[in-house]
Amino acid sequence: MLKTLLVQWLVFFFFFLIGSVVTAAEDDGSLSLCNCDDEDSLFSYETILNSQKVGDFLIAIAYFSIPIELVYFVSRTNVPSPYNWVVCEFIAFIVLCGMTHLLAGFTYGPHWPWVMTAVTVFKMLTGIVSFLTALSLVTLLPLLLKAKVREFMLSKKTRELDREVGIIMKQTETSLHVRMLTTKIRTSLDRHTILYTTLVELSKTLGLKNCAVWIPNEIKTEMNLTHELRPRIDDENENEHFGGYAGFSIPISESDVVRIKRSEEVNMLSPGSVLASVTSRGKSGPTVGIRVPMLRVCNFKGGTPEAIHMCYAILVCVLPLRQPQAWTYQELEIVKVVADQVAVAISHAVILEESQLMREKLAEQNRALQVARENALRANQAKAAFEQMMSDAMRCPVRSILGLLPLILQDGKLPENQTVIVDAMRRTSELLVQLVNNAGDINNGTIRAAETHYFSLHSVVKESACVARCLCMANGFGFSAEVYRALPDYVVGDDRKVFQAILHMLGVLMNRKIKGNVTFWVFPESGNSDVSERKDIQEAVWRHCYSKEYMEVRFGFEVTAEGEESSSSSSGSNLEEEEENPSLNACQNIVKYMQGNIRVVEDGLGLVKSVSVVFRFQLRRSMMSRGGGYSGETFRTSTPPSTSH
């Protein structure tokens, strides 16, 4: 800058001197001769000679300093070989010029003769070197022009590199802004906090006038202004001018709304757009809008969240009105990336909200289950207490009876028929106690194993016949019994289960509406149960009993009613009666438990005519050898049916 000013000042001074001389000549009318001899003049002869001498010495000093600078420059830089001769010629030319001016400074006064000779020689050398230098410039100028072109290309490349560096720096700055915005957005897990943080940070980064989020309503008919950077001020003038923005809504069929939702890119909004005018509160600056996917409902079937319906919100950004610049590419990229990050953050927040909601529901269900469990536990405790009370209430009188029965049999003076009745009462009471105990065990979740022991089969048959006679007479049935004396007395088994099964079989027949005569029969099972052939197979049965350790005995009841019609039984009524008869079901369970067989025969009316079961007992030969009273005859007793019914 200083060098330029100095050159301009020297040029101005040169033209000023020329102008002064021309003006003086015009004033005199003719060119006057130099008055160098005038001693009073400023430019006297002495002064001019001294000035020229000083000028020559200064020029010589300057010329001698320039080669020194050139030599220093050449030594500090790598000058290509084609330019070395040119530099040397310039150095020689400048040195000769300096010597010429230096020697010329000694010629303005008295001097030696060799000074003029030296001046002449150096002037000749200077002329020759200057001519050679001029010839060298003819070949040097194209190289200089080529270097200039190369310099221009390098400067152009430099400008392009500067522009690319600027773009890279802008991209880096954009990525930093996006990373900062993403960090701010991801700091919260609440949807409303995420949206509000997005508006605040985006406005700070881009210098926005306003920023708002429009979300569709539940029925997808309108877009509601739900989140805004600057809250509305409800003053009368603003409400009158803009119609009041509190709870503002626009139809979802608006052209800008449809255009933004159909595109994934950032869309520019015109100044007359409803979205732009409402978001900017009147006159809008450069405005853009972009859709933001929002996940509302999740389905967690199979552990994978599935979007039921995609919902799009709209993010609207407005620049200040007086800002001369419009939206840049980097700013649009920031808005697009931020919208994507907001969509991801909102989807994560929705999934967490759904998980929290499911957790709360599960906790509520768990509390309800705990309450139901406590209620069920209290109900079970109450039920167990009630059953225990009922069991105790049933056991007490039965145990009293069991305690009195031995006192009755203590004297041994009772007739045989009364003794049988007392034994039947004892066995019935024991069976009742066992049933009560079994009911308590089932309620407690425990099952007792089968109690197998030696017992008297004859006693069980007699007591069963006694109880059956009493029940039949009480219900208006006649009773008769057919028991084969060929049965062994002592066998191994569960006498209580046998007695219980016999009573259940009798209970099946007691449900008949048509009365009649009930026949109770007991005989060994040998593969043929026809009554007419029973006597013929007694000897074979005895051989079968003594040849094996086990014996099968059939117990059965049969009803004979007067006026019985013969017709084919219906299988459907049979099944229905079996399902409705609890005694038959209980009997079947006992038979299944003891691994026996049951047989039910129906008459023409679909009523049960006979029921029989087959049980397998283990024989005791020592006991059988003492039962020598077996003659193979049939013991029969009968009681006619009651006519009062």
Curated annotation (Swiss-Prot):
Domain Histidine kinase residue range list: 389-623
Reported tissue expression: Expressed in etiolated seedlings, leaves, roots and stems. Highly expressed in flowers, stamens, pollen cells, tapetum cells, carpels and ovules.
Cofactor note: Binds 1 copper ion per dimer.
GO molecular function (one): identical protein binding
Membrane topology classification: Multi-pass membrane protein
Quaternary state and interactors: Heteromer with ETR1.
Protein known as: Ethylene response sensor 2
High-level lineage: Eukaryota, Viridiplantae, Streptophyta, Embryophyta, Tracheophyta
